[in-house]
């Protein structure tokens, strides 16, 4: 009898002890979450409790009021330093824990990104390691260590579900070798805010600015807030996008970036506008040649090809790379609609254009001839030339297959969804550069008619300036 009552008493004590443990555990979790969500209030309450225990209630209230007044004065009077030292670090830690680390196991399990333990069906599955989290103003970067047996394609197939789980606008999966230094790592770019939603005014070059570097021509901004620059020297650039997607923004941003070199006579832009010249006529004073009808376009093509072949003959065996001078400037062939070049009714003209275009793309890079071409409707003919363009920019498109045609299938799998770009954001797109497997999201400058007129007035080539002075 006594043994039964003793066992009953021990069971009651065990139950009460477990209850206390659960209460303390839940209280601790609640306080931790409270501190994460309202760090200022939690800090003041902690100060009040400690002061009350050490000095009494009166001093606790006084100290709390003084601290609260000091914090609010700091926050209102010096918001930048408060955000840098207190606000941003706390918000970053809170987002890291609440959005990513706390739910990481559950999110991976729900999306089939865990692997069962061999021979232990009832054990917890293996979960990919979330090795690093970096919070950004618009894009968070997560470095994930893949499990043995996983590949980036497993994750790329789940980007839509992961975006919904993180409460993000989109998720892009990219190889993490360059960033993390390990081949089994991938990088998740979680975009929770669109930093490219608003138009970006053109950063006008100064009329007396130094000559532009052809290896770094600024044309816009990346979604991380850094300048978006394209390499023109030794490269060809292909720009694809639907009507109103912002192809003109990219082309005019490139012209604006090249303007100091145009004025110095080191860059000669030859513009071909097969659609009748409406888009680029306002900037004609900037161009070395401007053609918009079949006859004049063919004339420019032939002259440029002759110049290219003559340069190649002269530089062969002397140098591997052309250096622009006023006597031999770097030639930029600007084509507003690539597909229209081959749309002439005359079969002989079409064959000649195809031949000349192939020569430029194959031989022009080494002798100072760069092709910058825009295309509206990617076709099989354009896809055949795609590999000859080291830099490709995909703006808003109407179909999924067009993204793969302009960029690549791998770029689409990484999250370059050109067909999902809103029609209200012209100039937004994805850029893929030869030698870099990662796709970047960017937006070109918004170039107005006033900007074009200003460029045309201040950056004429030397030949036009001398002709005007005469």
Describe every region a protein language model picked out.
Residues 177-190, 319-330, 376-378:
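Glycine/charge-rich, flexible interdomain linkers and switch-proximal surface loops
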Residues 158-159, 174-175, 201-203, 376, ...:
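Short beta-alpha junctions and helix-cap segments that line functional grooves
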Residues 82-127:
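N-proximal, solvent-exposed amphipathic alpha-helical segments enriched in charged/polar residues
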Residues 3-89, 205-317, 328-404, 411-415, ...:
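P-loop NTPase catalytic phosphate-binding loop
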Residues 146-154, 227, 321-326, 379, ...:
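Short acidic, glycine/proline-enriched loop segments that cap or flank alpha-helices
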Residues 2-4, 101, 114-124, 137, ...:
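Phosphate-binding P-loop/Walker A region and its immediate neighborhood
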Residues 412-428:
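Conserved C-terminal "switch" segment of AAA+ ATPases
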Residues 117-141, 329-330:
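Short edge beta-strands and adjacent turn/loop segments
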């Amino acid at each position: 009898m006594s043994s039964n009552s003793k066992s009953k008493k021990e069971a009651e004590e065990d139950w009460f002890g477990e209850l206390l443990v659960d209460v303390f555990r839940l209280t601790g979790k609640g306080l931790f979450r409270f501190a994460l969500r309202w760090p200022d209030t939690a800090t003041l309450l902690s100060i009040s409790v400690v002061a009350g225990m050490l000095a009494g209630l009166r001093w606790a209230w006084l100290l709390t009021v003084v601290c609260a007044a000091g914090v609010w004065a700091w926050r209102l009077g010096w918001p930048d330093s408060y955000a840098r030292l207190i606000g941003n670090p706390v918000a970053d830690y809170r987002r890291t824990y609440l959005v990513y680390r706390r739910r990481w196991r559950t999110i991976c399990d729900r999306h089939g990104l865990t692997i069962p333990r061999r021979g232990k069906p009832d054990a917890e599955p293996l979960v990919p390691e979330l090795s690093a989290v970096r919070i950004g103003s618009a894009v968070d970067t997560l470095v994930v260590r893949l499990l043995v047996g996983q590949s980036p394609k497993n994750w790329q197939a789940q980007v839509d579900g992961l975006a919904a789980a993180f409460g993000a606008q989109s998720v892009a999966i990219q190889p993490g070798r360059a960033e993390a230094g390990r081949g089994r790592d991938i990088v998740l770019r979680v975009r929770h805010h669109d930093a490219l939603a608003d138009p970006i005014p053109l950063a006008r070059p100064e009329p007396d600015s130094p000559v532009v570097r052809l290896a770094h021509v600024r044309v816009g901004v990346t979604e991380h807030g850094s300048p978006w620059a394209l390499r023109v020297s030794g490269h060809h650039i292909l720009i694809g996008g639907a009507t109103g997607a912002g192809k003109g923004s990219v082309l005019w941003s490139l012209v604006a970036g090249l303007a100091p070199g145009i004025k110095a006579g080191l860059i000669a832009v030859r513009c071909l506008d097969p659609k009748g010249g409406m888009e680029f006529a306002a900037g004609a004073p900037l161009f070395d040649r401007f053609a918009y009808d079949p006859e004049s376009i063919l004339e420019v093509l032939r002259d440029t090809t002759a110049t290219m072949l003559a340069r190649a003959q002269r530089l062969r065996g002397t140098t591997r790379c052309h250096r622009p001078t006023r006597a031999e400037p770097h030639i930029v062939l600007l084509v507003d609609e690539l597909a229209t070049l081959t749309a002439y009714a005359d079969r002989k003209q079409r064959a000649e254009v195809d031949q000349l275009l192939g020569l430029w793309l194959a031989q022009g890079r080494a002798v100072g001839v760069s092709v910058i071409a825009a295309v509206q409707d990617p076709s099989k003919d354009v896809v055949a030339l795609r590999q000859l363009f080291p830099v490709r920019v995909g703006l808003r498109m109407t179909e999924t297959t067009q993204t793969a045609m302009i960029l690549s299938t791998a770029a689409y799998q990484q999250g370059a969804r050109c067909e999902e770009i809103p029609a209200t954001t012209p100039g937004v797109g994805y850029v893929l550069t030869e030698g870099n497997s990662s796709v970047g999201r960017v937006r070109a400058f918004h170039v107005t008619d006033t900007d074009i007129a200003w460029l045309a007035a201040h950056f004429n080539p030397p030949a036009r300036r001398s002709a005007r002075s005469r």
